[in-house]
Amino acid sequence: MLTDHFRPQSFNGIDDIVIVGGGLAGLFCALKLAPRPVTILAAAPIGYGASSAWAQGGIAAAMSKGDTFEKHVADTVAAGAGIVDEKMTRMMVAEGPARIHDLLEFGVPFDRDLEGKLLLSREAAHSERRIVRVKGDMAGKSIMEALIAAVRNTPSIRVIEGYVVEELVREGRFISGVIARPDAGQSKSRVSFPARAVVLCSGGVGHLYAVTTNPWEACGQGVGMAARAGAIIADPEFVQFHPTAIDIGKDPAPLATEALRGDGATLINSEGRRFMLDIHPDGELAPRDIVSRGVFAEVQAGRGAFLDCTKAVGRHFPEMFPTVYASCMAAGIDPVRQPIPVTPAVHYHMGGVLTDGEGRTSIDGLWAAGEVTSTGVHGANRLASNSLLEAVVFAARIAENIKGSLPAPKLTAWGDNAGENDDPVTVEDSPPFKVLRQLMSDCVGVVRTRESLTRAIRGIAELERTNKRLRFANIATTAKLIAIAALQRTESRGGHFRADCPDERPEWRRRTYLTLAQAERLAAEVAESEPA
């Protein structure tokens, strides 16, 4: 599907800038690049395949009278478990308020009080109320609706929907374009898009796992593509599990937003006991990794875990949290009167393609923003509502960097050019992908061990050996990077927990940097070793 103002066949000539992905980072970057000509390639209609549109909490920004940049930085560093890049974090936090004002100018209807001031809420591990929201739990949807309208009204932005990017084209040290498959990845032909600059905004890795809150499109293709092109990947072992996905057997799992606990909702087991009080002094508002392990332990013990909102929210649930309310009622659960069954689900990837403060990757010609990246601002455990902030801050910085480093083209030509052919694959329906998802959940999940990680690496290698299609190779590459980095990190920190190494170790108070070549060598060593 294409925007109304452009109907291409296939493409020739050179695009000025190609953005891969139609989520928050991609759309915001395109808008900040205007009037530079930009082509957005999106696997699904923009907004529909993006985790951004599903975000319920909001965007964190230090804007209230009692808040400061220093407090926001301190909270981010504390949540990140010792490996946050403080310089990058200070930059992100300082630019947050300006990006909120950009979003207001693009038409985002953030909640306001009777005097017109922005309403700010508090979420887990934040010391102040600094989350800007829309209608309680509709921030992501409302932000994306506003940006989509702005993009479709910007003549310099061309949106091509239903094109799945499968490969970054590298010529020497440079990325010179991308190759994509039309018809939502189902076409037998592929199309090349040469470009002067490529911005990767392809999202996260949630659907590498059997239980996730992410849309189907978030299956790790972007990280795998970049790694296969030679990019450095950082911190891939750090996967954040949201502790309160609604446990009703849906895929993806609906999310019970962090804001519910911020407003006083409690976590109980089937015996009615608030188990988080025994685990952390902040109880339900402890960092996500700690709450996730607490919920996981109750579920594994057979006691179950439930989010009790009956007293904290009660009859105000429908208007305060309409998205969560609708998900519960559709499953026959009335959250006004009943506790909500919850389970940990993959929600966010702190790791990804390594970028600097301008969004540049380790390969010339390739920038990246959003969840596909690892900027260092999240460390080992992302602070709630910092992800949308990171997306807009670094998307804007990429736009400024490209404007300053690439002179505007005099002419952009479009024509016909059929790409290389290959057999398409519907990733979400393929048996190998289902096997991979279960393998990752079982062996590289909330709790990991040397034995489970070794089993995962061997299982991934077998799946790669028997499945040669390019899209699967990208996805399996990302899974392998996560598992290898998790095996190498012989400690527990943030979103990475090893039952056989349950404590933090000072020698591991550092980030992980990994190339695909290094991961392949380590995987070969695992394959040759004795079974764990």
Swiss-Prot record:
Keywords for this protein: Cytoplasm, FAD, Flavoprotein, Nucleotide-binding, Oxidoreductase, Pyridine nucleotide biosynthesis
Residues annotated as the enzyme's active site: R288
Signal peptide (from-to): none
Pathway involvement of the protein, from the record: Cofactor biosynthesis; NAD(+) biosynthesis; iminoaspartate from L-aspartate (oxidase route): step 1/1
A Gene Ontology BP annotation from the UniProt entry: 'de novo' NAD biosynthetic process from L-aspartate
UniProt family annotation: Belongs to the FAD-dependent oxidoreductase 2 family. NadB subfamily.
Biological function: Catalyzes the oxidation of L-aspartate to iminoaspartate, the first step in the de novo biosynthesis of NAD(+).
Record-given protein name: L-aspartate oxidase
Species this chain originates from: Rhizobium meliloti (strain 1021) (Ensifer meliloti)
Lineage: Bacteria, Pseudomonadati, Pseudomonadota, Alphaproteobacteria, Hyphomicrobiales
Gene it is expressed from: nadB
